[in-house]
Regions:
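Conserved GNAT-fold acetyl-CoA-binding loop/helix
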Residues: 15-37
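Conserved active-site alpha-helix within GNAT-family acetyltransferase domains
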Residues: 95, 107, 119-137, 143
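Conserved beta-strand in the GNAT
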Residues: 49, 56-65, 83
Length: 148
């Protein structure tokens, strides 16, 4: 298994993974690529993939560097869109990807990681608890400001 940043050659497989993440996810691959191109050179955004021994993309996570002036004026990292291919779940891929993220955050002087997950993804929540995310720590809110 290998973990590294997603490259343009991985975009089709990345789109396939995102289709597994949400049943109603309808983003066109070209829309996804357009957004990725907008942030590709921004050092605060990282799109990381985990690959099996055959170099197939089997999981991904988005990692964003954020500022928290109330936390000893240090940075934290926001984790979004963690998805492991449904045929590779309950193996080591999710845990390995999250360990990579924790190591990355430590190396880059991050104080903590903040993770969001859709409320209905209870299996994912159990995974997060098992790897050390505390229960009932915060409540998150999301408000759409544009009607799609």
């Amino acid at each position: 298994m290998k973990i590294h940043e997603i490259t343009p050659k991985d975009y089709t497989d990345l789109h396939r993974l995102y289709c597994q993440l949400e049943d109603d996810w309808t983003s066109d691959i070209q829309d996804m690529i357009r957004v990725l191109e907008e942030v590709k050179d921004d050092p605060h955004y990282h799109l990381v993939g985990i690959f099996d021994d055959a170099d197939k993309l089997v999981g991904t996570i988005t990692l964003s560097k954020c500022l928290d002036l109330t936390a000893k004026a240090r940075f934290y990292y926001s984790l979004e869109n963690l998805v492991i291919d449904e045929n590779y779940r309950q193996q080591v891929y999710g845990q390995a990807l999250m360990q990579y993220v924790e190591d990355y955050v430590r190396r880059h002087n991050g104080r903590y990681v903040n993770l969001t997950s859709s409320i209905h993804r209870t299996d994912a929540h159990e995974f997060y608890y098992r790897i050390g995310f505390p229960r009932n720590y915060t409540v998150g809110f999301k408000k759409n400001v544009v009607d799609d």
